[in-house]
Amino acid sequence: MDKMELRYNSGNILNEEVHKIGIIALGSFLENHGSALPIDTDAKIASYIGLNVSILTGAKFLGVVIPSTEYSYVKHGIHNSPNEVVEYIKIMIEHSKKIGINKFLIINCHGGNTLIKDLISELNDKKTSVILENVCFTHAAFEEIAIGYAVGILSEDKMKTHSFKTYPEIGMIGLTEARLKNTDIDNEAKILEEKGAIFLDKNYGKTLLKNLINNHVEIVKKMSEGDSNVGRLPITRL
């Protein structure tokens, strides 16, 4: 059988090297986010960013990781072990290698998944590059509300009841064990308590989403050019 020659230069792509880059979305599917955001908020935001970056660059969107993990003391959803998450990613990587992909950008939008950082670094070798980029904000608070609106998963009607006084997972204000065991969580919760009610800033959400997409486009561009010095630009927070 004659070898099929593919037109790697076709379409709207940065360059032919993007065909060696795969984008993986990582979030969580079963996690409470108050009343205005769905339980799979993190997975949907990560997928939205990843797919749009793929469209704008030509890199391949490989899909979303099903399992997710979390710190044992953060109790607001159903999660898996770090090893289960990484094993799933390994399967995605192995199948992707068969279609010529050897560079992987994982866009993670769930704080608990930062636990896999060291395990992910072990997947790198001379032939494979795996980069984990974390986009994590205070849980179900200002940033997630804003970006949720921009993505289209926020219920504006349910914002009326989206309060940390009712839903303890918002800002993790009511998650006592998590606040006692993690100073970062406690500090973010204190900031939210001081601000009081959560409000929706639609313009901020649109700007935040645009910046996140553009930032990851730049990361893919650097990856396609062989630049190992990639990283996320600082995001202005409310």
UniProtKB/Swiss-Prot annotation:
InterPro entries linked to this entry: Creatininase-like_sf, Creatininase/forma_Hydrolase, FAPy_deformylase
Name of the top EC class for this enzyme: hydrolase
GO terms classed as biological process: F420-0 metabolic process; riboflavin biosynthetic process
Cofactor(s) of this protein: Fe(2+); Zn(2+)
Record's cofactor remark: Requires one Fe(2+) ion for activity. Requires an additional second metal ion that could be Fe(2+) or Zn(2+).
Pathways involved: Cofactor biosynthesis; coenzyme F420 biosynthesis; Cofactor biosynthesis; riboflavin biosynthesis
Keyword Hydrolase part of the UniProt annotation: yes
UniProt entry keywords in alphabetical sequence: Hydrolase, Iron, Metal-binding, Zinc
Residues reported to bind Fe cation 2: 33, 42
Subunit structure, as described in the record: Homodimer.
Similarity comment: family membership: Belongs to the creatininase superfamily. FAPy deformylase family.
Protein name, UniProt field: 2-amino-5-formylamino-6-ribosylaminopyrimidin-4(3H)-one 5'-monophosphate deformylase
Annotated source species: Methanococcus vannielii (strain ATCC 35089 / DSM 1224 / JCM 13029 / OCM 148 / SB)
Underlying gene: arfB
